[in-house]
Amino acid sequence: MYGIIEDANLTLEGINSSSLLTSGGSEQKTMERYKGETLALSAMIYFDLVRFFGDVPLKLEPSQADLSNAYLHKTDRDVILDTLMVDLKNAVELLPWADEVSGYTTEHATKGYAHALLANIAMTRAGWVIREQAKDGYETANYTDPTYPTQRPDAATRTKLYELALSHLSAIITNGTHKLNPSVENQWYLINQRELDKNYHENIFEMPMGLGVSSELGYTVGVRVNGATTEYGVKGNSSGKMKLTAPFFYSFDKKDLRRDITCAQVQLGAENGVTKESMLGNAPFGIYVGKWDVRKMNEEWR
């Protein structure tokens, strides 16, 4: 993850020192988009680092040849999140909305994503967190560990952060570029087809997979294909190791169309050369994730 941050710092250094950034016209707009994307992606990575590890080194410039700035002490997580929010406010001003510029799809970090990520960080900044040591002026949770206390900011600070998050989420809603697809079935069909949704842009940011790599979607996570069959690709099966539970299934209203798309109570298997569905039966902790369904995937992904 720090490798990505190093690349981002190098990119920002190059952009900020380029005359194209102030040249005017289309070249300046392109450089501004590059800068906005870089700020957003760097913030995304740092946000994950903070959520995973808490206080981590905050590195905002490329490494020097003598490595004099390569080995840094940890920075307080709140300082990091505050820095990211400032960067994202800048990114919001630099980035276009999805499809506002030709070819600028949700596979790029867009203005909508910068708004959404900033709101997410603001809400996280306002929340409870286990700290390495207590901070003055923060609220401490009841029954917290005395060595590593669980704390959150004071009420006034939380209110400001909530208002900040609301303003950025409202900007997304008001603009109207990103909307919920009225058909959840169509939304997941498009995802299985690896087809970008150009009508609703419900997924604010879709990170493309690497060339020749399709991750474990549809294999570890998805409808189970039990036994070898070439009908759905060369490998011919999927493990469906990630499971859902019966309490989750029954948390849906029986008329909720999302239930049977989310929860697959069947598995696929070859019988005399014919692929058939079979019910799982009594499997309260073994319901498959139906959203990724090999039957809906395009040939390139199978």
Where do the model's predicted regions map?
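Conserved, well-structured interaction surfaces
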Residues: 1-53, 68-104, 290-302
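Short coil/turn linking the two alpha-helices of tandem helical-hairpin repeats
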Residues: 50-52, 57, 121-133
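Solvent-exposed loop/turn segments at secondary-structure junctions
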Residues: 56, 64-66, 211-212, 266
